[in-house]
Amino acid sequence: RFAVEIVQEIKKLCGKDFPVSLRYSVVSKTKGFGQGAVPGEEFVEFGRDMAESEKAIKYLEDAGYDMFNCDNGTYDAWYWAHPPVYMPPNCNIADVEHIKNFTTKPVVCAGKMEPEFAAKEIAEGRIDAMGVGRQNLVDPEWINKLLEDREEEIKPCINCHNACFNFNCSKGTPNMQPMDDALHLARCALTPPTMQHNKYKIVPTKNPKKVAIVGGGIGGMECALVLKKRGHTPVIYEKSDKLGGMYNYASAMSFKEADKKLLEWYDRELKKAGIEVHLNTEIDPINPLTRQYDEVIICTGAVPKKLPVPGFNKTITFEELLTGDKDHGDKVVFFGGGQSACEAAYELVLQGKHPIIVEYANDLIATPGTCLANASFLREMLVFKKVPIYLEHSI
């Protein structure tokens, strides 16, 4: 009724020809209050099922809506409406294709849509358009690059929700900028100038410098690109045999293909910008190499902490687990149930292994700042996969 009253009032004030689109969740994908249903799970729908949706969309069309921008889910199953990295691509397409048969109005499908896949669906008449949100935040020029056959230049969205939607699970941070420059919920972790162009405006320097960047991870590579845009001459020194740093491990999981593409994007952009890179080169403060630079920026990241307790030498690090440098067998116990641990545990589940999680807090991923869609998916998927989870336990 509320949606009907809204469109009727809009048409009354703006005219019957004024187009109005509705974001329409086809099915709720909900098992109960605060309980979403993950992909592959058999469940009894607690919210709107397909039979109700078939009737509802006709009712809403008759009320005056001109287009339906469709996805799935509710706030109890928010990972369907805003799919995190763990969700499969085009995850809502089957339900959206079905509901199109029950309306004469254009139907849009949203939810990690792949352009090539969407183009095929549109050409075959299964949907009328694809909905795109987050990719516009990370690279506002992506559609022009796609049309101009410059696809390799598109900076990929990694579906992290670390800036665009993390406000939903924490108190957030005060927005200190003028409202004409930024909206708190429309930012991007990979592209800081998004909706913050005044705060992060790249201004050409009047005093060009030669700058050494120690560390070639994501931070070091982004630093080099920004310095280059400003007119400086950055040079990257990386002690390993490849760029990427810790992100090489973070992107190793099977569901992080977009993260791998991001590393490839950085590599191409550095080469295109002509930025000098030295691999297998370790730099310290007394290294004579640093004397030839006006400035030195340290981007070395962090190393795993080794606890001075008996038996700690038998543990393996996050990097060793994900790269397979050490045999971890079939059962792996995670000391801590944060996002990294839950992601790695899910990866082991996908490999047919048997992870166990021991967490001191009263919930998994209890740290503020993680998006609800990411956290709830991992919690509910690990339960669905019957991963043993021990909360409020210590070792």
State what each model feature region is:
Residues R1-V214, I218, E222-K229, P304, ...:
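Flavin-dependent oxidoreductase catalytic cores
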Residues F33-A37, Y79-P83, M246-S251, V309-P310, ...:
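Short acidic, glycine/proline-rich loop/turn micro-motifs
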Residues G64, T104, G125, G231-T233, ...:
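Glycine-centered short loops/turns at secondary-structure junctions
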Residues T205-Y237, H278-T290, C299-V309, K314, ...:
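Rossmann-like dinucleotide/flavin-binding elements
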Residues I236-A273, A345-H393:
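Rossmann-like dinucleotide-binding cores of NAD(P)H-dependent redox enzymes
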Residues E257, K261-E264, T281, L289-E295:
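Catalytic cores of nucleotide-enabled group-transfer and carboxylate-activating enzymes in metabolic
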